[in-house]
Design a protein with these regions (language model features):
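Conserved C-terminal helix/tail region of periplasmic/extracytoplasmic solute-binding proteins
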Residues: 320-347
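Bacterial signal peptide processing site
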Residues: 20-22
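C-terminal motif of bacterial Sec signal peptides marking the signal peptidase cleavage site
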Residues: 15-18
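Mature extracytoplasmic/periplasmic domains
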Residues: 259, 264-322
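A ligand-binding cleft/hinge motif common to bilobed small-molecule-binding domains
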Residues: 92-94, 221-222, 227-244
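Early extracytoplasmic/lumenal segment of secretory-pathway proteins
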Residues: 28-94
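Extracytoplasmic ligand-binding site segments that recognize negatively charged/polar headgroups
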Residues: 40-46, 81-221
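Periplasmic-binding protein-like
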Residues: 134, 197-202, 242-265
Length: 347
């Protein structure tokens, strides 16, 4: 009897070892796709977005997370094995100008035909599309603001003195503030001198510039400010702090902030990378992200109810009304703008 038990135990151990070996072989046999992205909502993306792609393509997605600047710098330094990188258009343009991205074959990304025109080639036909668009507009507290905010020009009103914040020039939306300042002066095309004259005029109204959204939220919640430009995707945080807060698409139009996907130069997974980009643009992935309030959809086939669309940059009319900036022009001129900002505006 003892021998029988020993034999059964030995067989069990062999079976477990075999199972473990098979599991290891399965994992080792899978292709890996390294995706560089932000760390927010990681659980959602792993379960709802990445897992279906992994199962369908027998691939393992490995994430490299961090902010735009750090992740781009890692690739620039050459110590990265990233295949696909998600970046805001502002940082993606830097990567393009530094020669860090491969060109894409749009025949491998047919879902590009299903997205809004503005998202198809925000940085040129040779590079990746945008998979989401955030609106840069104005949030304000009607209980604290002496005027109703409907326009960019309202931020320059004398009534708003000591009541607003604006993004710092080095933040993602800082360059947009320069463009807005030119527009407020009545310029039909960008005029740098007019912009900085306009910015000088608004500075007495600025309590503090913000570099991080959390700074804006804190000032807003504590009643230090009554209004300021912000991306709509962060408005939920303001609404939680101040339930009466309102988000406004200015009469002159908001600005589009786009997050893009690009294939990193040197990858040996170019085809798989393009397949992944196509998948992210598909209706199913776009709809999941939108309905979970994670990203605003660019796929035109995604249909949302008013409740589902609340807080998202959604709908053809709104998307088409947004201003876009030439990111190459921004990057070529940003150093000069930063110098002028620090020299002329910072006291």
């Amino acid at each position: 009897m003892k021998k029988i038990i020993q034999a059964v135990a030995a067989s069990s151990l062999l079976l477990l070892a075999a199972c473990g070996s098979n599991e290891g072989s399965e994992s080792e046999g899978k292709e890996k796709l390294v995706v560089s992205t932000w760390g927010f909502n990681e659980d959602f993306f792993r379960k709802e977005i990445y897992k279906p792609f992994e199962e369908e393509n027998n691939v393992e997605i490995v994430l490299d997370t961090g902010n735009n600047a750090d992740r781009l710098n890692k690739i620039k330094q050459g110590n990265s094995d990233v295949d696909v990188i998600f970046l805001s258009d502002y940082y993606a343009q830097q990567g393009i100008q530094d020669g860090l991205f491969d060109t894409i074959d749009r025949e491998n990304i047919p879902n590009v035909d299903k997205i809004y025109d503005v998202a198809k080639a925000p940085l040129g036909e040779e590079y990746g599309p945008a998979y989401t668009i955030a609106q840069f507009g104005i949030a304000y507290n009607p209980d604290e603001s002496p005027i109703k905010i409907t326009s960019w020009k309202d931020l320059w009103s004398a009534d708003m003195k000591g009541k607003i914040t604006i993004p710092s020039i080095t933040s993602t939306t800082g360059p947009m503030m320069v463009d807005i300042a030119s527009m407020v002066k009545g310029e039909e095309t960008f005029n740098e001198d007019a912009a900085f004259t306009s910015l000088k005029e608004i500075m007495p109204s600025v309590v503090k510039e913000y570099g991080q959204t959390s700074e804006y939220v804190n000032m807003f919640a504590q009643g230090e400010i009554a209004a300021g430009p912000i991306m709509e995707m962060y408005f939920a945080d303001l609404k939680e702090a101040v339930p009466n807060a309102e988000f406004v698409t200015p009469a002159e139009g908001g600005y589009a902030v786009m997050n893009t996907m690009n294939v990193v130069k040197g990858t040996d997974q170019k085809d798989l990378s393009e397949k992944f980009i196509n998948y992210i643009l598909g209706k199913e992935a776009q709809e999941k992200s939108a309905k979970n309030k994670v990203d605003s959809p660019v796929n035109v086939d995604v249909q949302l109810s008013d409740e589902e669309a609340e807080g998202l940059t959604y709908g053809e009319d709104l998307i088409n009304s947004l201003h876009t900036m030439d990111m190459k022009f921004v990057n070529d001129n940003l150093k000069g703008w930063i110098d002028r900002w620090n020299r002329e505006l910072i006291q």
